[in-house]
């Protein structure tokens, strides 16, 4: 069943691209259908994240264990982010996508509305404070996952502290999680339709011809994402004894959905379910995967480092090695704000450009082709979340390798 859905999604991507290219108006008219699919998934995210984290935190039994898990998770996120940013800098310096570019003939997109969010990205104190919710209902309504995770951990640890009195509540959350996973299976039946509509709308709105003047930038980003998928992640697999290509095969349909929707939230419930079935403990899955949506965006990190060097080259700003390393340090911090604001990657790019003295007006040029790069980098984030989950599980000595049976293993009959 999973293979069938993956095949259907692949066909939907191709058909959607054809519709958008040859019938752009009709393709754009399909946007509400795709947006409806994304909304169906997003309505599940907060209940499933909150319930699974409460169960996992209560099962750990102490704040010390959850703290240890959190520290290991953050360390891994920072290590892999630094490696990816370094790869992006290397590629941009070697391939020089911005050198010789005629800026006068390039389409620019209005990014004025994004400038209001840049202060939020670089205000690190506020970013930390925002993790602590003043109103749990408010952060749930806004899908603020880091704040939801924080409250859920405290709730779960407190529940463990009162012993048997918390059993009715724990049963409620266990049932809630099971219901949400079942609801996810039902919603995923509509995935091919949603993917087709979103692809048709994207190609219809932006067109393929928009890519031609910016081919070197798009090509450099795509090459970097390819190297992450098929060089960096396999090396991580060798070091940590992870069957990477087995994992990639297991989540391939989720990769395609994230690619077409440009949102990893749309695959969060399914990814959590599969990682648990693959052998990662619930307490690790429920913490690492949701927090990774904000803190572990490998594809987005590569895009940011390549784009910053592209801006410097396009506007003939000579950046020394020390300046590039400083920029990478800034990106390590600012990239954690990607999920906190609309058009996250563009906002982070704009904030970083301002911080390191690059011409911010160049972001308007990149914004014109951002959609196609957004699709690719979002897809690459998915195996990054899966790898992080397994690495942390092994670090916790809690990974139990299970035989992954592709046929009907997680998509039950509805």
Swiss-Prot record:
One of its GO terms (molecular function) is transmembrane transporter activity. Residues 25-42, 95-144, 204-219, 263-300 are extracellular. Keywords: Amino-acid transport, Cell membrane, Membrane, Symport, Transmembrane, Transmembrane helix, Transport. It comes from the Bacteria. One of its GO terms (biological process) is amino acid transport. It is a multi-pass membrane protein. Catalyzes the proton-dependent, binding-protein-independent transport of glutamate and aspartate. Belongs to the dicarboxylate/amino acid:cation symporter (DAACS) (TC 2.A.23) family. This is Proton/glutamate-aspartate symporter. It comes from Bacillus subtilis (strain 168).
